[in-house]
């Protein structure tokens, strides 16, 4: 089953950046159909940086505890093994303009992760020191296990990824936001089977995944690992982690996110429920 699914999904891509060639650097650092985020919003958003000619943004993440960041496994494993080459930048309106990069002491990738399309696309980063929580930087609330995030619920995804297919976020690289509707898993799975070689009996969208977006609004490359948040009873809850998709805002190809509620026990094995 694993090999069949891998062979059947050759064009489905995770939403992280590869390292840019020299001279392309600042062009390699969006959200489709969105707008610049207000400075007062999304205080849990972080940028993951890898060392090169400069500390380059390659994925997003969210602060879920003063000392812990939640991100996608395909962003940091198994390729990123050198902690010295990884940094975390807390909420920043424009990439690279006021960097205060934080070192990471530990990377924990879910043990069942193989590829984003197979699932378990979730990872934790432990910061060397807890951060000072403020109105500008603070944690996002994880949902209770019972929260389902019903189809049609309006949620928001944020990041610094591409603004369209193969269209990079231009300077000054602002944090972008877009509202996306939740889509029921079985409908999302049926859409991904359209035009695919995968048999109908092979599930593409699995129980640990969550779908959101449409042909006008979606996350895109470079947004990987960032949060999908939904407001429930006045509280922002992190429903998903940007994981993968086929293109960005393409017909019948919603964005696919790691479902946070599916991994709450695993998260809390490492991360205290209260700071």
Curated annotation (Swiss-Prot):
Disulfide-bonded cysteines: 59-75, 155-230, 188-211, 220-248
Known outcome of mutating residue 141 to M: In allele alpha
Catalytic activity: Preferential cleavage: Arg-|-Xaa, Lys-|-Xaa, but with more restricted specificity than trypsin
Removed propeptide positions: 19-30
Subunit structure: Homotetramer. The active tetramer is converted to inactive monomers at neutral and acidic pH in the absence of heparin. Low concentrations of inactive monomers become active monomers at pH 6.0 in the presence of heparin. When the concentration of active monomers is higher, they convert to active monomers and then to active tetramers. These monomers are active and functionally distinct from the tetrameric enzyme. In contrast to the hidden active sites in the tetrameric form, the active site of the monomeric form is accessible for macromolecular proteins and inhibitors, e.g.
Endpoints of the signal sequence: 1-18
Pfam family, one: Trypsin
Any one Gene Ontology BP term: defense response
SMART domains: Tryp_SPc
Record-given protein name: Tryptase alpha/beta-1
Annotated disease: Hereditary alpha tryptasemia is caused by an increase in the copy number (usually between two and three copies) of the alpha allele. Affected individuals have elevated basal serum tryptase levels that are associated with cutaneous flushing and pruritus, dysautonomia, functional gastrointestinal symptoms, chronic pain, and connective tissue abnormalities. It is not clear if the associated multisystem complaints might be due to the coinheritance of a second functional genetic variant.
Tissue expression as described in the entry: Isoform 1 and isoform 2 are expressed in lung, stomach, spleen, heart and skin; in these tissues, isoform 1 is predominant. Isoform 2 is expressed in aorta, spleen, and breast tumor, with highest levels in the endothelial cells of some blood vessels surrounding the aorta, as well as those surrounding the tumor and low levels, if any, in mast cells (at protein level).
One Gene Ontology term, aspect cellular component: extracellular region
Organism lineage string: Eukaryota, Metazoa, Chordata, Craniata, Vertebrata
Effect of residue 76 to L: In allele alpha
Segments forming domain Peptidase S1: 31-272
Subcellular location per the Swiss-Prot or TrEMBL entry: Secreted
Glycosylated sites: 132, 233
Main location: secreted
Record-listed E.C. numbers: 3.4.21.59
């Amino acid at each position: 089953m694993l090999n069949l699914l891998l062979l059947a999904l050759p064009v489905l891509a995770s939403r992280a950046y590869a390292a840019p060639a020299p001279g392309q650097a600042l062009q390699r650092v969006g959200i489709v159909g969105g707008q610049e985020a207000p400075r007062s919003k999304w205080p849990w958003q972080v940028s993951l940086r890898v060392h090169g000619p400069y500390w380059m943004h390659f994925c997003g993440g969210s602060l879920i505890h003063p000392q812990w960041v939640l991100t996608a496994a395909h962003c940091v494993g198994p390729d990123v093994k050198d902690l010295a080459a990884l940094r975390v930048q807390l909420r920043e309106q424009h990439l690279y303009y006021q960097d205060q990069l934080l070192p990471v002491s530990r990377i924990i990738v879910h043990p069942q992760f193989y590829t984003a399309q197979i699932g378990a696309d979730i990872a934790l980063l432990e910061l060397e020191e807890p951060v000072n929580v403020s109105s500008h930087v603070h944690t996002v609330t994880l949902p209770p296990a019972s929260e389902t995030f019903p189809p049609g619920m309006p949620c928001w995804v944020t990041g610094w990824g591409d603004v369209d297919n193969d269209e990079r976020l231009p300077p000054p690289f602002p944090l972008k936001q877009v509202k996306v509707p939740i889509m029921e898993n079985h409908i999302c799975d049926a859409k991904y089977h359209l035009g695919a070689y995968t048999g109908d009996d092979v599930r593409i969208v699995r129980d640990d995944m969550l779908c959101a977006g449409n042909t006008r609004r979606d996350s895109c490359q470079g947004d990987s690992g960032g949060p999908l948040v939904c407001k429930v009873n006045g509280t922002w809850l992190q429903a998903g982690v940007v994981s993968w998709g086929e293109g960005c805002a393409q017909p019948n190809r919603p964005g696919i996110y790691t479902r946070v509620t599916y991994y709450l026990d695993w998260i809390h094995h490492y991360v205290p429920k209260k700071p």
